[in-house]
């Protein structure tokens, strides 16, 4: 029973719960971005290059032969996945940049400390010695 208690304590610590929430939200955010890329960005981009759907871009490495299916390299799907990644990475970058801006504490300028009584006295003695040396020459 103690192993179960240890596991429960571990799982309920703040960091683990925060991480789990972050992963779940990240997965949902990834789906939103994938939909944005597939349904909003890629169709106009395909239209600009001649009305082609990126998912259709592929190279047939070996045609189908009887019962053996064709060997196809679908680089269009890969390109769409790369666009997904770039947009997700940019969105995360912007979110972190915003969070850093919100949480960055501006350094408060420290007031210049007044010299202590000893320092003031030593400065006066130094100045007097300079005056005396200047008059003696």
UniProtKB/Swiss-Prot annotation:
InterPro entries on file: Mechanosensitive_channel_CS (IPR019823), MS_channel (IPR001185), MSC/AndL (IPR037673), MscL_channel (IPR036019)
Q: Where are the transmembrane segments?
A: 10-30, 76-96
Q: How is this protein annotated for GO cellular component? A: plasma membrane
Its primary localisation, in coarse terms, equals membrane
- Localisation per UniProt entry: Cell inner membrane
> Which Pfam families does UniProt cross-reference here?
MscL
Q: Which PANTHER family match?
A: LARGE-CONDUCTANCE MECHANOSENSITIVE CHANNEL (PTHR30266:SF2), MECHANOSENSITIVE CHANNEL MSCL (PTHR30266)
Q: What is this protein called?
A: Large-conductance mechanosensitive channel
Task: Tell me the gene name.
Answer: mscL
